[in-house]
């Protein structure tokens, strides 16, 4: 551990204590030596006693900087781990930091391009268009075609700072896990590992560029989503160049109203976009907060979304997709028994779970929702409530499902902000039912067979040889098993014989000893003793030597 990491660790502890976060720790995590260290090494007064725990955690993370802000944003979606109060407070964290010097941005860009900016771009603006904790965006014009572009560049030394904070977080998580015990449902080390994978993915702008290209290709002919063109020849791990867009932020409702945007169509398209990305493409944008979503300025009566920042993308396994679709359908059919079964079948909840108790818990939580009109039922909150209920049954929430839940909450929130009367169920149900029909019907079976057909056709000439080899292997296995069985039976026979002789010798030795004590002149005790010694020797020598079969 370096001096810098020790200094950073002290700063983190000091900040957490200034906000009194040690007061909210469970007794297991505050043994006597913790309290001793708290009152001696860290004699720091809690300056925020009058504020609730969730708000104190939010303020502390805001002060600790970008890595902790992003961790807080991720934790805000983990309502299977945190209470509503804490999760809601963390959801308000904003990734806003002052920009770094434009001259440093120029140096970083030219280091990646290995050429002066002016040789490739005109009108490079050193004043950033936007600034975040990991990267910064500058505008320019592409010299080759005169088109407006944006250059996204990583902050100087951001990787080193993030790696140092991640190492500190990982060590702290392991300590917390040790104090709480292995069975604790919080699983801090697992949470930090999920976060590490997510944030390190954002540090590679080349990967983000590839994600953007893939998402763009998925929606090339779409009326719902436009992804700006990426100039891949200018993309590197620390630099990304893409088309500049001139949309309206999705959160600027006044500007959208002023241009006469069709809000109902826009909200419905947002829902369709989510389900298309998840169920058709299995590749969804997992960071769709208002800062990354814009609306087109042209054709407000037929508006489309513009998606930016593809640093965090999610995918689901085929199994997870099917279980998720069935979960939604079962919920709206009020089939709580099926929901409980799905959670167990998918492995999200242990197969040892009491099915009836789990079903009843789901019913208690979900049934009151049906007292509302369908257009007031929140898909995102359905997932939240189900995860929260499953938390008491030790649910294991997969990272990809957390990303999905986060995306669904964003999309649904945006949809209802644009058009409060949005009936998410009416928009989503046909899509889900059609997808399920495609997955389990005759067409799906034919599609799966046709997909595998080229592979089977390629392997068909090898079938006779494979069958012969398997039969040959089967004969060898049978022969080997027979040999093992023979060896085992022989071993058992030897063991029985040896045990019989040893037990008999023990009986003779005991009898001889007892008789000789009564009358040493008789020859019988000596016969017993000698016979016992001989039998013991024979029995010991006849023990089976090899236990390998």
From Swiss-Prot:
The chain crosses the membrane at residues 496-516, 520-540. Residues 123-501 form the Protein kinase domain. One of its GO terms (biological process) is regulation of ubiquinone biosynthetic process. Its main location: membrane. ATP binds at residues 129-137, 152. Pathway: Cofactor biosynthesis; ubiquinone biosynthesis [regulation]. Belongs to the ABC1 family. UbiB subfamily. Is probably a protein kinase regulator of UbiI activity which is involved in aerobic coenzyme Q (ubiquinone) biosynthesis. Disulfide bonds: none annotated. It is a multi-pass membrane protein. The active site is at residue 287. Its EC number is 2.7.-.-. Keywords: ATP-binding, Cell inner membrane, Cell membrane, Kinase, Membrane, Nucleotide-binding, Transferase, Transmembrane, Transmembrane helix, Ubiquinone biosynthesis. GO terms for cellular component: plasma membrane. It comes from Shewanella baltica (strain OS185). This is Probable protein kinase UbiB. InterPro entries: ABC1_dom, Kinase-like_dom_sf, UbiB, UbiB_bact, UbiB_kinase. It is found in: Cell inner membrane. GO terms for molecular function: ATP binding; protein kinase activity.
């Amino acid at each position: 551990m370096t001096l810098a990491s020790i200094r950073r660790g002290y700063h983190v502890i000091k900040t957490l204590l200034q906000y009194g976060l040690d007061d909210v720790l469970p007794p297991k995590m505050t043994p006597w030596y913790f309290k001793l260290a708290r009152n001696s090494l860290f004699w720091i007064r809690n300056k925020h006693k009058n504020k609730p725990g969730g708000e104190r955690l939010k303020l502390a993370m805001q002060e600790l900087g970008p890595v902790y802000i992003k961790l807080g944003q991720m934790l805000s979606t983990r309502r299977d781990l945190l209470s509503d109060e804490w999760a809601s407070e963390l959801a308000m964290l904003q990734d806003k930091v002052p920009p770094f010097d434009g001259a440093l941005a120029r140096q970083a860009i030219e280091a990646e391009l290995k050429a002066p900016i002016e040789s490739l771009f005109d009108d490079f603006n050193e004043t950033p268009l936007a600034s975040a904790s990991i990267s910064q965006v500058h505008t320019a014009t592409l010299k080759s075609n005169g088109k407006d572009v944006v250059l996204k560049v990583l902050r100087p030394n951001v990787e080193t700072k993030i790696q140092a904070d991640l190492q500190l977080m990982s060590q702290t998580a392991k300590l917390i896990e040790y104090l709480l015990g292995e069975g604790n449902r919080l699983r801090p080390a697992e949470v930090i590992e999920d976060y590490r994978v997510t944030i390190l993915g954002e540090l590679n702008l080349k990967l983000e560029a590839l994600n953007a290209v893939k998402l763009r290709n998925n929606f090339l002919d779409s009326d719902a989503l436009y992804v700006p063109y990426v100039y891949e020849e200018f993309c590197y791990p620390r630099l990304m160049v893409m088309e500049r867009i001139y949309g309206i932020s999705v959160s600027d409702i006044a500007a959208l109203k002023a241009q006469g945007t069709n809000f109902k169509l826009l909200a419905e398209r947002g829902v369709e976009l989510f389900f298309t990305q998840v169920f058709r493409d299995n590749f969804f944008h997992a960071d769709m907060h208002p800062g990354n979503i814009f609306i087109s300025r042209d054709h407000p009566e037929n508006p489309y979304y513009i998606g930016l920042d593809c640093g965090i993308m999610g995918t689901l396994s085929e199994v997870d997709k099917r279980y998720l679709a069935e979960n939604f359908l079962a919920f709206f059919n009020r089939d709580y028994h099926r929901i409980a079964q799905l959670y167990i079948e998918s492995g999200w909840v242990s197969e040892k779970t009491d099915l009836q108790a789990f079903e009843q818990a789901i019913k208690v939580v979900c049934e009151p929702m049906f007292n509302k009109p369908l257009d007031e039922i929140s898909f995102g909150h359905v997932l939240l409530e189900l995860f929260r209920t499953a938390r008491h049954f030790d649910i294991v929430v997969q990272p990809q499902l957390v990303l999905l839940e986060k995306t669904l909450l964003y999309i649904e929130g945006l949809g209802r902000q644009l058009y409060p009367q949005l009936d998410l169920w009416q928009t989503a149900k046909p899509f889900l039912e059609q997808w399920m029909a495609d997955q389990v019907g005759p067409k799906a079976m034919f599609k799966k067979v046709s997909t595998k057909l080229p592979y089977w056709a390629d392997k068909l000439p090898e079938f006779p040889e494979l069958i012969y080899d398997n039969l040959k292997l089967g004969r060898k296995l049978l022969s080997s098993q027979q040999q093992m069985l023979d060896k085992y039976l022989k071993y058992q026979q030897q063991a029985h014989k040896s045990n019989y002789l040893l037990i008999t010798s023990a009986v003779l030795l005991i009898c001889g000893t007892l008789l000789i004590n009564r009358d040493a002149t008789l020859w019988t005790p000596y016969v017993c003793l000698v016979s016992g010694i001989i039998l013991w020797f024979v029995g010991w020598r006849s023990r089976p030597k090899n236990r390998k079969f």
